């Protein structure tokens, strides 16, 4: 007779009822005998070596090779022959009084844009604007669209074609625009006399300022556009401002001679 305090044997199927600390996942044998633990040995050095081998294998697959000092060796970067430029477009409005010069000079305007900057360009007569667009395959300069827009803008402001093309060849040229009223508030005949003082007889004063400061000046009513380098624009602006404020032309010419001598010494 079995003692009432003896442990009951498990069923014939060999399964054990899950205890309070057993796994709650059904269908797997989560019990392990104590003898199995003798076969499981964890060595820190072995695990470190295995991890190092795995890391080295992964680096070799990724193309990373370490030298004797442990520094990575990278393959030389492949030279990129062409830079991809995303497709962009720009519209440059053309004033009505510049449409006729634009049509007459169109055969000389679009070749620098198409051949040099690799842009797509067309004249839209309906909207009275020049449309520029980059091509992802042919355009290589990221700043080509801005250069083309500046070139067309300079021509629409009244600059000659050769002076406008210089914006494409040189990177240190700028255009500055200001009005006479920004310097001094003038109306009526006083404004007309100020414009005449800047231009001079037959444009001699304007040409003298341009030659002395190596700039190009356009007088468009009360607006003044100056094309040139940063320092040259500042010198030309000072001469124009002096004429607007009422300085005698002789004094302005003397200052221009001083400016011209300084530029010769600098360059």
Curated annotation (Swiss-Prot):
Keywords: Cytoplasm, Nucleus, Ribosome biogenesis, RNA-binding. Residues 48-62 have a biased composition (Low complexity). The keyword Cytoplasm applies. SUPFAM superfamilies: Eukaryotic type KH-domain (KH-domain type I). Residues 188-240 form the KH domain. It comes from the Eukaryota. It is found in: Cytoplasm; Nucleus, Nucleolus. GO terms for biological process: ribosome biogenesis. One of its GO terms (cellular component) is nucleolus. CDD domains: KH-I_PNO1_rpt1, KH-I_PNO1_rpt2. Residues 1-35, 43-62 are annotated as: Disordered. The keyword Electron transport does not apply. It holds the Pfam family KH_PNO1_2nd. GO terms for molecular function: RNA binding. Belongs to the PNO1 family. Required for small ribosomal subunit (SSU) synthesis. Has a role in the processing of early nucleolar and late cytoplasmic pre-RNA species. Component of the small ribosomal subunit, ribosomal RNA processing complex (SSU RRP complex). PANTHER family: RIBONUCLEASE Y, RNA-BINDING PROTEIN PNO1. This is Pre-rRNA-processing protein PNO1. It comes from Eremothecium gossypii (strain ATCC 10895 / CBS 109.51 / FGSC 9923 / NRRL Y-1056).
